[in-house]
Amino acid sequence: MLNTMFKNILSIMLVGTVFTAVAQQPTAAMKSKLAPKQLMTDITLAGSKLVAVGERGHILISEDGEQWQQANVPVNVLLTSIDFKNDNVGFVTGHDATLLKTTDGGLNWSIVNYQPELDKPLLDIKVLNNNVIAVGAYGLFLQSTDAGETWQDSFQDELLIEDDRLYLEELKEFEPDTYIKERQYMLPHFNSINVIGEELYIAGEAGFLANSDVNGADWQVIETDYFGSYFSIVKVEDSLLLAGLRGNLFKSEDDGESWRLLNTGVKATINSAFKDSQVTYFFANSGNVFYTLDNEVINNYVLDDGKAVMAGVVLNNFVYLATEAGIKKVPTSEFTSNKARD
């Protein structure tokens, strides 16, 4: 089982710098027939293809959900997230501040950023037209506005608590070297970045939630009165659903002004969410897939092996799952009715 400690490991750069950083040459991922049965952390669609990422630099591609081809990947670190701009251009994040790019639908990947000396993983990435943002531990924030051709790293000081912001302002003026060192660990882990309508949302540790316009400017903190970590947020109709540790799932019907706890019935950390046309899925530890048809009643499907479910996507009447024990699929018919809970 992937416990909270493992999720926190997954959740474990200077202003205005344009970069492509490769401080040292990494080791390329090895091809393995067992890759589809090993830890996978995220899965998405590139056109009609399934593409999944996971441990040891594994990236897997499938046309039919049955046969999986392993991509050529120049790193062997734990990969954490994947997203595509179109059928061909996509991006992957991972540990050692790894950022990869493909231009051929995921078959071959090149390094955009690789900085093991930072000791900070990138945890999530989202692509919206030409705007690409990757986030990670201790407020790591990398952005491209030209579909990944050039990148900037920035420190989002508007997301600091007030005391920390004032402290850093003083350091910046009188002790600039200390300022650079101190600010490296002042922001919380940014666990996920999510596109909701014309806004971006970052969910993170210690109850952190913030949003901005779709360009990633003018970030504002949203208070939630919860101090555990969040890992995903999704909007369904007029409601925001915010997911985190120990099965905590919160609902807001007033754009984040107030939140109330929904009953998932199981204290399993929710790792990510996916919204289909009729069903919203929440993928969780201990084999749990929470789902809702009405944004209120939370149902639960449990994998027989009890392995953590990290992410999922729907294709051709199946939900394809990235799990602790590899890629699995479940018919969407398993998620079509509300189930009574005691």
What residues fall within each predicted segment?
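Hydrophobic alpha-helical membrane-embedded or membrane-associated segments
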Residues: 12-15
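N-terminal signal peptide c-region/cleavage motif recognized by signal peptidases
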Residues: 18-20
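Bacterial N-terminal signal peptides that target proteins for export
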Residues: 1-10
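Residue-level hotspots at or immediately adjacent to binding/recognition sites across diverse folds
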Residues: 23-342
